[in-house]
From Swiss-Prot:
Name used for this protein in its record: Epoxidase atD
Gene name of the encoded protein: atD
Taxonomic source organism: Aspergillus terreus (strain NIH 2624 / FGSC A1156)
Protein's UniProt keywords contain Glycoprotein: yes
Keyword entries, A-Z: Glycoprotein
Biotechnology section: Terreic acid is a metabolite with antibiotic properties. Terreic acid also acts as a selective inhibitor of human Bruton's tyrosine kinase in mast cells and other immune cells.
Length: 320
């Protein structure tokens, strides 16, 4: 199901790709495609999500290994939402929705179904679904800062992609940090009593508190379209507030930068030479010297003086 974990790096993650500003995002070479849609009233997001069984054509070796492994992305890992109800409506193929251990197969003929807050669930593409499975996902708007919304999905799918393809697995702390910021909590094992309680506080303590102290943050500029919203979310959390930089809001537009750059160049006295292109400056002086030399040569001929111009522009005069 793609939930391959590795030993935590104990250092902040740096994205490998940029996907901010895209209404449609594609991950894992098109194995997963998400199209963000306008959410209906009372819902925090809506998107059309498509999973494929495989990818055709020549593909990089790291993606090939992932597709052939048990960790091929075919749906999110088992999770629950503390505050939100999630909705599913299949458009194409067969989607399996598992809620509290009970699986239901959904097709385009089925009506939208819901999974209430607190239920442990997952969904994935059925093996018998032809080429792909497409489902419309949405969730209730709980009004809290950290919930399922576009900011969360852009960052989770961006990190999921980069971690599995380029880092060999998910950093446990980073994963819990992002999940906590999206009301997306990983339950404890099925045999564990109070698995939902433990799963929730594990995300909060490890992902939010310890992760925040170590410099982990849930959102990244490279993945996030509405960065102002993401910054507001992180500034509201005391554990991530210090990790947020907001000077970007005062960045000048390109036209403003051009206007500021049109001012006269400052002079630097004896430091000026090393802030110029010495090669080009030397060539310019040579060219000017040669031009001046030719002019004087013409003048010398007219006055009966033969003029020889050296390469450096200096003159030797001889009486004719």
């Amino acid at each position: 199901m793609g939930e391959l974990f590795k030993w935590p790096s104990f250092s902040p993650f740096v994205p490998f790709h940029v996907s901010a500003g895209q209404t449609v995002i594609r991950k894992f070479g098109g194995l997963l495609t998400c199209e963000f849609l306008p959410p209906p009233p009372g819902r925090s997001f809506m998107m059309r999500q498509t999973y494929r069984h495989s990818v055709e054509g020549p593909i990089p070796e790291n993606l090939r290994k992932l597709i052939e492994s048990d960790h091929r992305p075919d749906g999110p890992p088992m999770h629950f939402h503390q505050w939100q109800t999630e909705y599913f409506k299949v458009e194409e193929g067969i989607c399996v929705v598992e809620v509290n251990g009970k699986q239901t197969m959904l097709t385009p003929d089925d009506e939208e179904i819901s999974c209430k807050a607190g239920n442990i669930h997952r969904f994935f593409i059925h093996p018998d679904s032809r080429e792909r499975m497409t489902v419309i996902l949405s969730a209730s708007d709980s009004g809290v800062d950290y919930q399922l919304d576009r900011v969360f999905f852009e960052n989770w799918y961006g990190y999921w992609h980069d971690a599995l393809l380029y880092q060999g697995g998910l950093d446990f702390i980073q994963t819990l940090c992002i999940h906590d910021a999206g009301d997306h909590y990983t339950p404890g094992p099925a045999w564990l009593p109070f698995r939902r309680f433990i799963g929730y506080w594990m995300c909060v303590v490890i992902g939010r508190w310890i992760g925040g102290l170590l410099g982990y943050k849930p959102f990244f500029r490279e993945y996030t379209t509405d960065w102002d919203f993401a910054v507001t979310k992180m500034k509201a959390n005391p554990w991530t507030r210090r990790l947020v930089n907001d000077s970007y809001a005062n960045k000048k537009s390109w036209d403003e930068q051009v206007e500021l750059s049109s001012r006269p160049k400052a002079q630097n006295a004896d430091y000026e030479l090393l802030v110029t292109d010495i090669t080009e400056e030397n060539r310019r002086k040579k060219a000017n010297g040669a031009t001046n030399g030719h002019a004087k040569l013409a003048n010398g001929t007219a006055t009966g003086v033969a003029v020889e111009v050296k390469e450096n522009g200096e003159e030797l005069r001889k009486r004719s």
